[in-house]
Amino acid sequence: MTVDLLLGLQWGDEGKGKIVDVLTSKYDIIARFQGGPNAGHTLEFDGIKHVLRTIPSGIFHKNSINIIGNGVVMDPVVFQKEIEGLQKFNIDVQSRLFISRKAHLILPTHRLLDAASEAAKGKAKIGSTLKGIGPTYMDKTGRNGLRVGDIELVDFKERYKALAEKHIEMIDFYKVDLQYNLAEMEEEFFTAIEDLKKLTFIDSEFYLNQALKEGKSILAEGAQGSLLDIDFGTYPFVTSSNTTAAGACTGLGIAPNKVKDVFGIFKAYTTRVGSGPFPTELFDEVGQTMAKVGNEFGSVTGRARRCGWLDLVALKYAVEVNGVTALYTMKGDVLSGFETLNICTSYKYKGEEIDHLPYNIEEENVQPVFVEKKGWKQDLTGLTSYDALPIELKEYITFIEEYVGVPIKVVSVGPDRKQTIMK
């Protein structure tokens, strides 16, 4: 068998959690390959909204095995609360969730380092979620980090202490005023570590490759979005991991030739949380309406998302970098009621019109060029077939397909798993 990938093509918050939930029944294993609790995957069904931060979105399906891969960074405290939330709904976590021993741990001092580093940047801050993600990945690449497998070692606490002391020295170097009680944070951390020990740790690269040999199907689930990729995103306003398709191979230990389909998820408009370039951002009532109707607030941070028109230049870039084979468009229902819709098809950059992302994509350097499309009035939330969609939306979809060269296979018309139309 092969592995299919599911990725976000924008700046995150595209709706990946819902689509994983919809697709899970087709797969034996759902595997998360990068990121940490800075991202929230939102799922809604039976009138209840669920937000997952580290655990794969397949956990709600009783026949699926869920893997947290080696490319993920885990905060035991956040993870413990996530487990407790699932247990309230009698979700069987114990037998269906396995964690890679090679996944790195977020320490309390990683979170403090994150806060100190961001505070020291002043106006140049990048909009970090302050969850300790960046410092943890820094320790990983610097070969200083602690991994899940280290929990099983007799000298784990000594290893923790040595690393935490290094962090405190670094925090003091920043000379910022942080209010914290490290003793309380550490007590909470080690309590969560004891709970983490109750779960199954695995060598996930061996587990997944053996599963492929046995003919099992795997869906690799990404976090954040392609435009936040550490290499290919709008650097330095990016996350600390590879959110693109290549990250699935390194984050799970699977070979590139095992990958079959790549599903790219994108909103029918564009959003972004935090700082960074956003060429099609709206600052008027239209943007405010998108935010209100789309309930555009971060599922983890609660921060308001910036909203703007669909950027096809950026979308095509993400499609190409990921080798996307099928597109899933989300939140078309949010655009219902707009008389006209704008779609960005190129940029004005240094006196020229270009159709690719430039190296320096600062707002003052890039101006979007729009094509205007007719909007639709119809409420989409109750529709169940592609034929029932308004002609204007179908034309919108066709325009996107022709521009990026990849078919749109799914149209989401609401947050519930049932509000998903297969084309």
Regions found by a protein language model. Name each.
Residues 1-423:
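Non-transmembrane, aqueous-exposed alpha-helical and coiled segments at domain scale
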